[in-house]
Amino acid sequence: MQIVAQNWLVLSLTDSAFFLGLDAFLQQLPIMLFTLIGGVLADRYDRRRTLLASQYVQMATSATLAVLMYFHAVQIWHILVLSFVTGLAQAFGGPAYQSLVPSLVAKKDLPNAVALNSIQFNVARVIDPTLFGATLVVFRANGYDEPQAMNAAFALNAMSFLVVIYTLMALRVKHL
Protein backbone atom coordinates (compact mmCIF):
# COMPACT_ATOMS: atom_id res chain seq x y z
CA MET A 1 0.00 0.00 0.00
CA GLN A 2 2.88 2.33 0.86
CA ILE A 3 4.52 2.24 -2.56
CA VAL A 4 1.36 2.97 -4.53
CA ALA A 5 0.24 5.69 -2.11
CA GLN A 6 3.70 7.23 -2.13
CA ASN A 7 3.90 7.18 -5.93
CA TRP A 8 0.49 8.84 -6.08
CA LEU A 9 1.63 11.46 -3.57
CA VAL A 10 4.84 12.21 -5.49
CA LEU A 11 2.85 12.73 -8.68
CA SER A 12 0.27 14.85 -6.83
CA LEU A 13 2.97 17.09 -5.37
CA THR A 14 5.26 17.43 -8.37
CA ASP A 15 3.44 16.23 -11.49
CA SER A 16 6.90 15.02 -12.48
CA ALA A 17 8.00 11.66 -13.83
CA PHE A 18 11.55 12.64 -12.83
CA PHE A 19 10.66 12.83 -9.13
CA LEU A 20 8.64 9.64 -9.37
CA GLY A 21 11.70 7.86 -10.77
CA LEU A 22 14.04 9.54 -8.28
CA ASP A 23 11.85 8.36 -5.41
CA ALA A 24 11.97 4.76 -6.65
CA PHE A 25 15.72 5.03 -7.26
CA LEU A 26 16.41 6.38 -3.77
CA GLN A 27 14.46 3.53 -2.20
CA GLN A 28 16.29 0.88 -4.24
CA LEU A 29 19.79 2.40 -4.03
CA PRO A 30 20.47 1.41 -0.40
CA ILE A 31 19.19 -2.09 -1.14
CA MET A 32 21.69 -2.38 -3.97
CA LEU A 33 24.55 -0.89 -1.93
CA PHE A 34 24.01 -2.37 1.53
CA THR A 35 22.25 -5.74 1.21
CA LEU A 36 25.56 -7.62 1.23
CA ILE A 37 26.52 -5.85 4.45
CA GLY A 38 23.06 -6.65 5.79
CA GLY A 39 23.68 -10.30 4.98
CA VAL A 40 26.95 -10.31 6.92
CA LEU A 41 25.21 -8.70 9.89
CA ALA A 42 22.36 -11.23 9.67
CA ASP A 43 24.94 -14.01 9.89
CA ARG A 44 26.76 -12.49 12.85
CA TYR A 45 23.99 -10.99 14.97
CA ASP A 46 20.52 -11.90 16.19
CA ARG A 47 18.40 -12.02 13.03
CA ARG A 48 15.17 -11.50 14.90
CA ARG A 49 16.44 -8.29 16.48
CA THR A 50 17.83 -7.07 13.18
CA LEU A 51 14.49 -7.73 11.54
CA LEU A 52 12.66 -6.03 14.42
CA ALA A 53 14.83 -2.93 14.01
CA SER A 54 14.10 -2.92 10.29
CA GLN A 55 10.36 -3.16 10.91
CA TYR A 56 10.46 -0.35 13.49
CA VAL A 57 12.28 1.92 11.04
CA GLN A 58 9.83 1.14 8.23
CA MET A 59 6.90 1.75 10.56
CA ALA A 60 8.45 5.07 11.62
CA THR A 61 8.95 6.23 8.03
CA SER A 62 5.34 5.43 7.17
CA ALA A 63 4.07 7.09 10.36
CA THR A 64 6.24 10.16 9.66
CA LEU A 65 4.70 10.49 6.23
CA ALA A 66 1.21 10.13 7.75
CA VAL A 67 1.95 12.89 10.28
CA LEU A 68 3.40 15.17 7.60
CA MET A 69 0.30 14.57 5.47
CA TYR A 70 -2.00 15.22 8.44
CA PHE A 71 -0.40 18.61 9.08
CA HIS A 72 -0.22 19.43 5.34
CA ALA A 73 3.53 19.85 5.71
CA VAL A 74 4.81 17.16 3.35
CA GLN A 75 7.32 18.26 0.73
CA ILE A 76 9.05 16.24 -1.93
CA TRP A 77 12.36 16.21 -0.08
CA HIS A 78 10.63 14.57 2.91
CA ILE A 79 9.45 11.75 0.70
CA LEU A 80 12.85 11.29 -0.92
CA VAL A 81 14.66 11.12 2.43
CA LEU A 82 12.07 8.73 3.86
CA SER A 83 12.39 6.52 0.78
CA PHE A 84 16.15 6.28 1.26
CA VAL A 85 15.72 5.45 4.96
CA THR A 86 13.12 2.81 4.09
CA GLY A 87 15.53 1.31 1.58
CA LEU A 88 18.25 1.20 4.24
CA ALA A 89 15.91 -0.64 6.59
CA GLN A 90 15.04 -3.10 3.85
CA ALA A 91 18.71 -3.62 2.98
CA PHE A 92 19.37 -4.87 6.51
CA GLY A 93 15.98 -6.44 7.23
CA GLY A 94 15.71 -8.40 4.00
CA PRO A 95 18.73 -10.65 4.58
CA ALA A 96 17.72 -11.15 8.22
CA TYR A 97 14.25 -12.20 7.09
CA GLN A 98 15.54 -14.58 4.44
CA SER A 99 18.02 -16.20 6.82
CA LEU A 100 15.41 -16.52 9.57
CA VAL A 101 13.22 -18.90 7.54
CA PRO A 102 15.55 -21.93 7.86
CA SER A 103 15.53 -21.43 11.65
CA LEU A 104 11.75 -21.72 11.75
CA VAL A 105 11.19 -25.03 9.96
CA ALA A 106 12.67 -28.49 9.87
CA LYS A 107 15.23 -29.10 7.14
CA LYS A 108 12.87 -31.44 5.26
CA ASP A 109 10.21 -28.69 5.17
CA LEU A 110 12.57 -25.95 3.96
CA PRO A 111 11.72 -26.18 0.22
CA ASN A 112 8.01 -25.83 1.03
CA ALA A 113 8.71 -22.94 3.41
CA VAL A 114 10.75 -21.13 0.76
CA ALA A 115 7.95 -21.67 -1.77
CA LEU A 116 5.33 -20.35 0.67
CA ASN A 117 7.54 -17.36 1.41
CA SER A 118 7.80 -16.61 -2.31
CA ILE A 119 4.04 -16.95 -2.74
CA GLN A 120 3.42 -14.63 0.22
CA PHE A 121 5.75 -12.02 -1.22
CA ASN A 122 4.11 -12.07 -4.64
CA VAL A 123 0.55 -12.12 -3.26
CA ALA A 124 1.43 -9.02 -1.22
CA ARG A 125 2.60 -7.29 -4.42
CA VAL A 126 -0.90 -7.82 -5.85
CA ILE A 127 -2.90 -7.11 -2.70
CA ASP A 128 -1.09 -3.93 -1.63
CA PRO A 129 -2.24 -1.76 -4.56
CA THR A 130 -5.74 -3.19 -4.15
CA LEU A 131 -5.77 -2.22 -0.47
CA PHE A 132 -4.64 1.29 -1.35
CA GLY A 133 -7.39 1.59 -3.95
CA ALA A 134 -9.98 0.30 -1.49
CA THR A 135 -8.76 2.72 1.19
CA LEU A 136 -8.95 5.62 -1.24
CA VAL A 137 -12.46 4.65 -2.40
CA VAL A 138 -13.83 4.13 1.12
CA PHE A 139 -12.44 7.39 2.47
CA ARG A 140 -13.46 9.40 -0.59
CA ALA A 141 -16.98 7.88 -0.44
CA ASN A 142 -17.24 9.04 3.18
CA GLY A 143 -16.49 12.66 2.35
CA TYR A 144 -12.74 12.79 2.82
CA ASP A 145 -10.63 14.55 0.22
CA GLU A 146 -7.77 12.85 -1.60
CA PRO A 147 -4.96 13.98 0.75
CA GLN A 148 -6.94 12.77 3.77
CA ALA A 149 -7.57 9.42 2.09
CA MET A 150 -3.87 9.09 1.24
CA ASN A 151 -3.02 10.02 4.83
CA ALA A 152 -5.26 7.17 5.99
CA ALA A 153 -3.36 4.79 3.72
CA PHE A 154 -0.02 5.82 5.24
CA ALA A 155 -1.42 5.57 8.77
CA LEU A 156 -2.92 2.12 8.09
CA ASN A 157 0.37 0.95 6.63
CA ALA A 158 2.24 2.19 9.71
CA MET A 159 -0.21 0.36 11.97
CA SER A 160 0.14 -2.83 9.94
CA PHE A 161 3.75 -3.07 11.08
CA LEU A 162 2.51 -3.58 14.64
CA VAL A 163 1.27 -7.06 13.71
CA VAL A 164 4.66 -8.00 12.29
CA ILE A 165 6.51 -6.49 15.24
CA TYR A 166 4.29 -8.29 17.74
CA THR A 167 4.80 -11.59 15.91
CA LEU A 168 8.57 -11.13 15.81
CA MET A 169 8.66 -10.24 19.50
CA ALA A 170 6.71 -13.40 20.34
CA LEU A 171 8.98 -15.53 18.17
CA ARG A 172 11.44 -17.67 20.09
CA VAL A 173 13.90 -19.37 17.81
CA LYS A 174 17.05 -21.19 18.82
CA HIS A 175 20.31 -20.83 16.94
CA LEU A 176 19.87 -17.22 15.91
Please give the residue ranges for each predicted region.
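Substrate-agnostic recognition of the 12-TM MFS/MFS-like secondary transporter fold
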Residues: 1-6, 22-42, 46-61, 78-137, ...
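Transmembrane alpha-helix termini and helix-breaking/packing motifs in multi-pass membrane transporters
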Residues: 7-13, 66-71, 127-156
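Short helix-capping/hinge motifs at transmembrane helix termini and TM-loop junctions
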Residues: 15, 38-39, 69-73, 90, ...
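Loop-to-transmembrane helix entry
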Residues: 15-28, 148, 152
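A helix-boundary/kink motif common to multi-pass secondary transporters
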Residues: 15-16, 46-47, 106, 140, ...
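Primarily residues marking transmembrane-helix entry/exit sites
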Residues: 17, 73-80
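C-terminal ends and interior cores of transmembrane alpha-helices
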Residues: 56-73
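Helix-loop junctions on the cytosolic side of multi-pass membrane transporters
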Residues: 72, 99, 103, 148-150, ...
